[in-house]
């Protein structure tokens, strides 16, 4: 996929990131993929569990082309070195249309009687997307979340929505093996709902939401997109219907979490 120049190789000789204007804690560069070592590092990952405030402390990294994300290294499948990252097998998110991607997934998983309703309308931001992402990251790092041992990572990517594809994450492979298609949807959600990719585990994706739906109708429209994106959220979740899922997991929610079996 097309990316900006990768600044991560500079950290091999400068682990603290001083040359990039950063003050990084101890960490490591990861280049492990399912196909063998990558030509350049895919990400930098901190060596210690993330604490509240760690995300905001690396705000300056954005100006270097590095974007933050929390990675769970203790979710039963190890950390990113064990995830069979496959960056060379994925398409570029910008080559796809979110409506077409979701429409095809909807037709594959929804009832034959249910037509794809199309994309929900954009909503009004109630928070700065990057500030909301920092808030959600702090809450995830404060314990009691889906993440067992979250580590702050930095990824060379054009936008937050591209992070999963940029590192070659394939946690949704049982649903859709080309993460580039899913990142096309994330780009659309970034534009319409102010999402940011805040955390990744082996088979889980957590987003912050700066423009959440505030009416049941808006929530149900977005819930349809969630079903196409991740049917397991509904079919294997705590809510047996799309309506119940919309009310409890989408309406007024500042966090969207997706899990694939």
PLM regions and their residue ranges:
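Extended, low-hydrophobicity segments enriched in charged/polar residues
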Residues: 2-163
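Generic alpha-helix detector with strongest preference for long hydrophobic helices that associate
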Residues: 39, 147-151, 166-170, 188, ...
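Short linear motifs at secondary-structure transitions and domain/linker junctions
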Residues: 43-48, 125-130, 171-174, 180-186, ...
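Short glycine-/aliphatic-rich beta-strand segments at the starts of folded cytosolic domains
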Residues: 158-175
């Amino acid at each position: 996929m097309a990316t900006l120049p990768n600044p991560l190789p500079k950290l091999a000789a400068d682990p603290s990131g001083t040359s990039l204007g950063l003050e990084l804690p101890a960490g490591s560069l990861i280049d492990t993929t399912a196909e063998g070592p990558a030509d350049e590092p895919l990400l930098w990952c901190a060596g210690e569990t993330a604490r509240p405030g760690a995300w905001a402390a690396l705000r300056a990294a954005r100006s270097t082309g590095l974007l933050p994300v929390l990675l769970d290294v203790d979710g039963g499948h190890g950390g990113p070195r064990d995830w069979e990252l496959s960056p060379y097998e994925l398409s570029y998110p910008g080559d796809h249309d979110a409506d077409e991607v979701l429409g095809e997934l909807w037709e594959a998983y929804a009832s034959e009687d249910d037509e794809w309703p199309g994309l929900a309308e954009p909503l009004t931001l109630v928070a700065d997307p990057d500030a909301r992402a920092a808030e959600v990251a702090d809450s995830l790092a404060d314990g009691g979340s889906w993440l067992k041992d979250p580590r702050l990572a930095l990824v060379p990517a054009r936008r937050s929505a591209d992070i999963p594809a940029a590192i070659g994450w394939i946690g949704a492979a049982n649903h859709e093996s080309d993460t580039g298609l899913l990142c096309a949807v994330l780009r659309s959600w970034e534009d319409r709902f102010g999402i940011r990719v805040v955390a990744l585990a082996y088979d889980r994706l957590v987003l912050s939401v700066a423009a959440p739906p505030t009416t049941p109708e808006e929530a149900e429209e977005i819930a349809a997109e969630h079903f196409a994106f991740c049917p397991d959220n509904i079919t294997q979740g705590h809510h047996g219907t799309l309506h119940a899922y919309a009310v409890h997991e989408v309406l007024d929610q500042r966090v969207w979490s997706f899990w694939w079996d």
